[in-house]
Amino acid sequence: MKISEPPAISKPTRDESELIRMYLKTIICDFKAPMLIAFPILMGLMLKETVKSSLFLRFIIMLLPFSYSALECFLLFRNNLESSYRSELHKMPYSIFNVLLIAFSVISILSIAIFPLSTWSNNDVSSYSMLLPCLIVPLTYMLSISCSLVSGSILFTDTGIDILIDASLLLCTLLLLVFWIIESKYFPYFVFASLILVLIRSFRTRHAPSKENSLPVTAWRVVVFGSILVLSIVIYGSIAYELLDPIHQGWKTIERRIHHL
């Protein structure tokens, strides 16, 4: 009796492999914002005790959201530099934005370098893995996707249902900060609400992007943009304040070692 050979499994061709690779790359690029929120949250929930004792895991938790904010803020800064201005008076607000964007980027880089070096408590793990990603990533995402800082128009650019999504995300970010400060039991709900809203917004950006051409400069669009910018200043300013103590302690340690030489 002749035993039939199993059917050969065809391997993907080079072109098919390239298409798969490009598709995965596109998915990662389009959905990087929700992924950069989700991964630190999962690490904080599943590896809390390990994170407290592992410098590498603490570094990864800081790297994921803050590398995104550092890069996006720098790209916005570069785009502003490449814009043309009609007058020196018109150039002034863009100069202010450039200073803020560079400050946001520098604060993000310092956060990656400094925060992992400190000792983390259980509260610190929750703060760094859940709170900061849900504050930093959505605000940076809205600044880069939903706001215009160039071409003579400073405004919020969303249209249609994207307006409701980003307004909900902005409110969720504000409430997340408030509930963290008052140590509310509802804090985790806003963490996951923020993640879901960013995921929905990323899906909309990929499949149904807003049409931002020739938008009127209306008061409400400027107000929403101002709210995003002010909340960003508050968040990054608070992070910069938290960085002062470890920087000061590190400087004192360096001075003591120099004196002992």
UniProtKB/Swiss-Prot annotation:
Domain of life: Eukaryota
Family named by the database record: Belongs to the UPF0328 family.
Name under which the protein is recorded: UPF0328 protein ECU06_0100
Source organism: Encephalitozoon cuniculi (strain GB-M1)
Organism ancestry: Eukaryota, Fungi, Fungi incertae sedis, Microsporidia, Unikaryonidae
